[in-house]
Amino acid sequence: MKFTTVFFDIDYCLLDTPTSERRIIKELYAQQGQIVDDAVGDQYRQINKELWVYLDRGEITREQLYVMRFTRLFAIHPFFKPAEEVAPWFLDQLARAHDAQAGAEHLLQRLRGSGVRIFTASNGVGSVMNGRVEMAGLSKYLTECFAADEIGAMKPSHQYFDYIFKHSGETDLSKTLMVGDNPVTDVNGAVDYGMVGALFGARWQEPSKATFVAKTMKELENILFGKE
């Protein structure tokens, strides 16, 4: 195991966010007596993904994103409440969602047992993200959790990665790994700073500067520790 410090993104990485989002979308439409399938949740996720690109570029604010994703979804699947009213409800539900990614706890346990220091590094709201990780039973493996609102910068900025690296206590960038699902904000941002990048999942098709690519936690474990 060559890495001594590993940073993990939270949504779509340590947490199985798609499962949570599909469930919440079903609960939302149940409020108007409508049963929807996973396809509606998947449409929401695609809309959300597209809007996050604009947010990462600084073209919209986080608050605008929260409302716009439902404005667009309701244009396809009408809902009896306005997007402005649904947005805070959805955030509250998501803050309670804590579906762990399959194999995440096992990998964290193995990394921790190997003496690796483990951190989370997200572009989300710290209090919300940390609470979800704790409810998922993963916080006991973590050294510290970093979030954009507490740092005052977002991935992929140099300021963000400079902060988490310096506050991690690590001194060797070549022994520092960033694992995330976003090829631009997670992987390319980390690699441009000097870390090693690992792209997790299959949500994005864009090219990245990742040294490692894994679709599952088991694949990532095999990459880091070698196949048993």
Language-model-detected regions and their locations in the chain:
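Asp-based, Mg2+/Mn2+-dependent phosphohydrolase catalytic module
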Residues: 1-6, 109-112, 119, 124-228
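N-terminal helical cap/lid subdomain that shapes the substrate entry/recognition surface
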Residues: 2-102
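Conserved strand-to-helix beginnings and helix N-cap segments that scaffold or border functional pockets
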Residues: 18-22, 101, 105, 130-132, ...
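A short, Lys/Arg-enriched amphipathic alpha-helix followed by its capping loop at the start of a domain
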Residues: 28, 107-114
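A generic structural signal for short
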Residues: 58, 95-96, 117-118, 174-175
